[in-house]
Amino acid sequence: MSRNAAFSPPPDARAYRLSTARGEFAVIDSPVADGVAARGTVLMLPGFTGSKEDFTLLQAPLGERGYRTVAVDGRGQYESDGPEHDEAVYARPELARDVLAQVAALGTRVHLVGHSLGGQIARAAVLLDHAPFDSLTLVSSGPARISESQRLRVKLLRDALDTMTMAEVWQVMQAMGPPEEAGAPAPGHGREEPERLRERWLGTRPAQLLATGSQLCTEPDRVAELAALELPYHVLSGAYDDTWPVPLLDEMAVRLGARRTVIEDAEHSPNTDRPQPTAHALADFWDGLRRGGSGRPGL
């Protein structure tokens, strides 16, 4: 989760429910800035316990660079519908098919961006069908399961959800401070909007958290499968990350032949920790593809 999520959408952005063949999904759709030539469309997938608002601070700067951005709540996240207790609908292949349905509903090819859990869902969608995508950017999202320390914290969250209400779990996380992948505002953290973050937490379906939490703890390494596809890749992260250590992300980028960006003074959520340099790095990558680059180092 991004703890500095911004709940006020950019000027001219529209919040609506995107109708797809697999149901409706809540989105924030931010256009290209006035007077700027359109360069492409971006679909953005949030992480565990996150939401579309985790990308709000990127949307205006990307619009100024010519990119329409559509940030989406996945099935069972915040303002998108999903069952409370049926974990089967949140299986990784099902979430990947949701992404393909979202792209089809947008009616255009997209640059796909996934933060953390969203990156692994994005990867699964690309492996199902990479044809609708112009590129894939993995933001603080690693090759396989999360680190041991984060697995322990996610297990604690899953255990709590078995015995406590969502409201009770929120109170515990506020008191203790969250793991990077089990979202609540850290005590004394000044930039978040606590009531909106609580509202987001309460809107997320418990079954979605249980299913995706398990996925984070068991995800296999699928980098070789991804590298076999003809698609430009970008691995972007902060300078520190306990969920997937930065050297592991460096290695993954090499295995993918991906562009690699490290955002200084950012941690697990560069999209909210340092949105301006993150937006610039994203747009620079996509602009390079428009100029005929492969997105891969040395090519």
Please name every model-derived segment.
Residues 1-42, 64-67, 107, 134, ...:
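Alpha/beta-hydrolase fold catalytic core
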Residues 26-82:
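Conserved HGGG/HGGXW glycine-rich cap/lid loop of the alpha/beta-hydrolase fold
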Residues 147-152, 165-228:
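Conserved alpha/beta-hydrolase catalytic His-Asp/Glu region
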Residues 230-266, 272, 277:
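Conserved loop-alpha-helix segment in the C-terminal half of the alpha/beta-hydrolase fold
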Residues 73-78, 142, 266-267:
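Short beta-to-alpha linker loops that shape the active-site pocket of alpha/beta-hydrolase fold enzymes
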Residues 123, 127-128, 133-164:
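Flexible "cap/lid" loop of the alpha/beta hydrolase fold
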